């Protein structure tokens, strides 16, 4: 079964799934901090100002630029800031392949919180990762995401489509 995303031909922007928006808890961001240079400029391309990425990284003294499709900033069309040190976020699951493709094209260090299931599933994906330098970091427990920042408890095992 082919799982690569079908692209919207008119816009050249990958189509998103309505279940793509899950929010990351702080405990999934904190392990990244030790790998970042102090006072870095970080672009969070899938994040609103309420994002845990924005809040945690800013609180650690980093300059953070957040952009989000809902406020008109499309990651696939947005001009990458020249002086950005890192690109960090939790991308929409249904377009993660296209996100990684663009990140490799941009050529800046990045950290994307994604599940590894299906990451290398197709030959196209496998080749893309094989042709680029990247590292993986695994957590010692499964991440429980929020569907709404107002939720008291994270949603366990969110659906991925």
Locate each region found by the language model.
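Class I S-adenosyl-L-methionine-dependent methyltransferase catalytic core
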Residues: 1-161
């Amino acid at each position: 079964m082919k799982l690569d995303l079908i692209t919207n031909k008119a816009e050249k922007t990958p189509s998103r799934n309505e279940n793509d928006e899950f929010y990351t808890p702080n405990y999934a961001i904190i392990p990244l901090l030790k790998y970042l240079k102090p006072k870095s400029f970080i672009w969070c391309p899938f994040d609103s100002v309420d994002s845990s990425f924005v809040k945690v990284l800013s609180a650690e003294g980093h300059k953070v630029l957040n952009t989000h499709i809902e406020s008109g900033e499309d990651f696939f069309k947005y001009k990458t800031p020249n002086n950005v040190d890192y690109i960090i976020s939790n991308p929409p699951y249904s377009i993660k392949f296209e996100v990684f493709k663009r990140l490799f094209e941009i050529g800046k260090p990045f950290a994307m919180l994604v599940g590894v299931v299906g990451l290398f599933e197709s030959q196209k994906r496998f080749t893309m990762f094989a042709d680029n330098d990247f590292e993986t970091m695994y957590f010692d427990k499964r991440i429980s995401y929020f569907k709404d920042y107002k939720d008291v408890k994270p949603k366990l095992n969110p659906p991925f489509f």
